[in-house]
Amino acid sequence: VKDNGSVALRTVLERCIIRIGGITKDSVKPNKWKELIQGMYINDQDYAFMKIRALSIGDTLTVTNKCPNPSCKKKIKTEFDIDEFDIIPYDGIEDIEFELPKGYYDKEGNKHTTGTIRRPVGLDREILDISARNNFGLANTLLLARCIKTLGDVKIHDSVIKDLSMKDRDYLLKLLAEHRCGYDIGEFDIECPECGEQFTVTLNNADFL
């Protein structure tokens, strides 16, 4: 489960969700239901999973971290209440418009700056989990290649994303983060009870499995 968290999460959702809008699980073929779950925004997948988790084992999440102080390294257990996480509402924007700070130049020297990008869905996460685990640079390249819908009249593929400036890539990743929705999980400040060291921990989906 820990080694393939995105697939494990999707499998739980496949089995536990019985209706999406007007579509019930029993009204479609299993492969179609799987596609529907994979096509959910990652934020929606996470929200649904948190609800299922709360119904199954309660609202409390316990996370263990090690104090970063070299002279301490105490294991610290921290409890989080799922109900206390803020929920960011969906803004209703399906295709997010953008204008790159620097722009992409094609082989003819034409500059392209405007386009649209979509939020990542469950299938994107599964592919990134398999293809780019522990390689954040590659993961970001694949993510943008899959999520950018238009960039001028350029056909989007991995090499286009690799040719973007770091400023443009950072801009697009920040844009996606700004348009996230669902549970606002992320970074939390923790103080070691043993030595008083203060540090920041980041929650991710694997912590909830």
PLM region spans:
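Short, surface-exposed, charged amphipathic helix/loop patches that serve as local interaction elements
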Residues: 1-209
